[in-house]
């Protein structure tokens, strides 16, 4: 501690003041009587007070006189460029080292490090951080930029290496801004998990109190973080999960790939971290199975792969009568749309619909050259469209439907395809086809997006054969009342049973019965007991898959499967 010489001055009113010991070379003596400027008399008493020395935290950022930022360290950090370190003496006599972060010119052509995407943001922001290979590769890119770039710049270069604390465990090398964050990270190496869940039969342990608090909410069901969007009612266990969700509304992608020429951006740093490994070639997760040794860029892909060896399939379809199991959640999600007949994602360029955003994004990239289309961007766009559609639906009245009935007659001796009625409901001129059993029980509704209009072909699938009923597609041909006949065509092209179509109000002409076909199809599984299930055909979907899906749906009982305009 440092001593300062002060003198106390007792004023005439009894109050005490402190006077610095030396005033312009003069010395005030103990007990001396002095007269102050306001005319009052004071007595001098000398005392000693202690001034606490100012201590710096290791790695603390400080602002220098020239306005630049530096970092204080008690000892030189391993791996730092000696030319970027400056030894200084603190007031308490100790020596510290100031680290001046390296600046990268913004016009660099090897590696562009944006202001909000410095290398320090790339290292271990979440549970999984970058491995040492990735960090080294990025630093090599940055150092090459410094070596090849001119020394002079406009002073607005981006700081690299702000993370002052590097993990010393072999093969790790992850970087952190504070000693506390490094200490928390090191628990992943030591296995220290002192925060344990108290719920019965759980006993999970965590490295941080925040991790435990978030986990406990899986037991309590608490979701305190609610989406602020007016039309969205979702809530989340953690603020981080809420922040990621909000970006689906705003379209924000704050985490950009730092590699020049890539330009991709992501909603979370973890997704970006995995993406960067496609540039560096790092695959930190290796399959331990003998004779396998496959490497993966993410822990999720690694875990899914390991289940191939173990045979574990933890994700089960909950649809009654199905019970299929999958090794990964994404496969279960994709499987579920088979039961819902849902293709909610529509291409804005050509109108094709898809079940997954990943398939739509791949279609946009290959068919329309939209290289920036990704699974996340299409999901965000879809959710925004859903919100707009919900808002518009509240303002517009429901249209009144009109009906056109189609009756198909099949020979009684043919038990494979029982008699059925297909009814077309026109709402605002848009036809909607419903398949109805002989006893009048409606089984499924098919939207205009599923059929593309009346011109779509309906495949009637049985356990023994597949036939196609062609319905004319041009609405101007629905002109006069009457009865007309079209022909059902088998899979090999052979004409089979004639089908009579009875229309009311609007008609189909006989000579155009096979005039128009559209690329989309709906498969109808017909059984001897009169049960009908319609299944939307996907590209390259096999007949076996169609029968499997429809059979599973029929096991649920005779229920009405209503669909929206996009089949959901």
From Swiss-Prot:
Q: Where in the cell is it found?
A: Nucleus
Concerning Pfam families, the annotation shows: zf-C2H2
What biological-process terms (Gene Ontology) are attached? positive regulation of transcription by RNA polymerase II; regulation of transcription by RNA polymerase II
Q: Which domain of life is it from?
A: Eukaryota
- In this chain the sequence repeats are located at 34-45, 62-73, 88-99
**Residues covered by region (3 X 12 AA approximate repeats):** 34-99
Location, primary (coarse class): nucleus
Q: Where is the composition biased (Low complexity)?
A: 379-396
Q: Name one GO molecular function term.
A: sequence-specific DNA binding
Question: Zinc fingers (C2H2-type) at which residues?
Answer: 165-189, 195-219, 225-249, 255-279, 285-309, 315-339, 345-368
Which stretches does the entry tag as region Disordered? 365-401
UniProt keywords (A-Z) are:
DNA-binding, Isopeptide bond, Metal-binding, Nucleus, Repeat, Transcription, Transcription regulation, Ubl conjugation, Zinc, Zinc-finger
Q: Where is this cross-link: Glycyl lysine isopeptide (Lys-Gly) (interchain with G-Cter in SUMO2)?
A: 24
The terms describing its cellular component in GO are: nucleus
Q: Which Gene3D superfamilies match?
A: Classic Zinc Finger
Main role? Answer: May be involved in transcriptional regulation.
Family membership: Belongs to the krueppel C2H2-type zinc-finger protein family.
Give the protein name, as stated in the record. Zinc finger protein 76
Source organism: Rattus norvegicus
């Amino acid at each position: 501690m440092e001593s300062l010489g002060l003198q106390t001055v007792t004023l005439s009113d009894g109050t005490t003041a402190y006077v610095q010991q030396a005033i312009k070379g003069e010395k005030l003596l103990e007990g001396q009587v002095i007269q102050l400027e306001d005319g009052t008399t004071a007595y001098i008493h000398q005392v000693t007070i202690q001034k606490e020395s100012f201590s710096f935290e290791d790695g603390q950022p400080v602002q220098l006189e020239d306005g630049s930022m530096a970092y204080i360290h008690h000892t030189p950090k391993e791996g730092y460029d000696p030319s970027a370190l400056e030894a200084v003496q603190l007031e308490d006599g100790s020596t510290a080292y100031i680290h001046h972060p390296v600046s990268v010119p913004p016009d660099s052509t090897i590696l562009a490090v944006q202001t909000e995407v410095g290398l320090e943001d790339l290292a271990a922001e979440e549970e999984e951080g970058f491995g040492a290979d990735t960090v080294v590769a990025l630093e090599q890119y940055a150092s090459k930029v410094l070596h090849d770039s001119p020394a002079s710049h406009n002073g607005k270069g981006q700081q690299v290496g702000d993370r002052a604390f590097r993990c010393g465990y072999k093969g790790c090398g992850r970087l952190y801004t504070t000693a506390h964050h490094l200490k928390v990270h090191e628990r992943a190496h030591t296995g220290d998990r002192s925060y344990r869940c108290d719920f019965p039969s759980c006993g999970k342990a965590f490295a941080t109190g925040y991790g435990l608090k978030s986990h406990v909410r899986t037991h309590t069901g608490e979701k305190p973080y609610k989406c602020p969007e007016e039309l969205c009612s979702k809530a989340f266990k953690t603020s981080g999960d809420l922040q990621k969700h909000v970006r689906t509304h705003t379209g924000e992608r704050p985490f950009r790939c730092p590699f020049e020429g890539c330009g991709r951006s992501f909603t979370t740093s973890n997704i970006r971290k995995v993406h960067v490994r496609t540039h560096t070639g790092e695959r930190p997760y290796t399959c331990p199975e003998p004779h396998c040794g496959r490497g993966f860029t993410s822990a999720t892909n690694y875990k899914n792969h390991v289940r191939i060896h173990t045979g574990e399939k933890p994700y089960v379809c909950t649809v009654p009568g199905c019970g299929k199991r999958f090794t990964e959640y994404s496969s279960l999600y994709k499987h579920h749309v088979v039961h819902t007949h849902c293709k909610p994602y529509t291409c804005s360029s050509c109108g094709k619909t898809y079940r997954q955003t990943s398939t739509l994004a791949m279609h946009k990239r290959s068919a329309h050259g939209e290289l920036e289309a990704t699974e996340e961007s299409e999901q965000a766009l879809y959710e925004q469209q859903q919100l707009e559609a919900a808002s518009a639906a509240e303002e517009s009245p429901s249209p009144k439907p009109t009906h056109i009935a189609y009756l198909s007659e099949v020979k009684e001796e043919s038990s494979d395809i029982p008699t059925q009625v297909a009814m077309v409901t026109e709402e605002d001129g848009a036809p909607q086809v419903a398949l109805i059993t002989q006893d009048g029980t409606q089984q499924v509704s098919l939207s205009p997006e599923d059929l593309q209009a009346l011109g779509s072909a309906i495949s009637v699938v049985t356990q023994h054969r597949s036939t196609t009923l062609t319905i004319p597609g041009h609405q101007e041909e629905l002109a006069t009342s009457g009865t007309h006949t079209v022909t059902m065509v088998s899979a090999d092209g052979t004409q089979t049973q004639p089908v009579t179509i009875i229309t009311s109000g609007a008609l189909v002409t006989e000579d155009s019965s096979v005039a128009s076909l559209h690329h989309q199809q709906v498969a109808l599984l017909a059984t001897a007991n009169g049960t009908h299930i319609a299944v939307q055909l996907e590209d390259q979907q096999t007949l076996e898959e169609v029968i499997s899906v429809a059979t599973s749906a029929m096991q649920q009982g005779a229920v009405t499967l209503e669909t929206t305009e996009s089949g959901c």
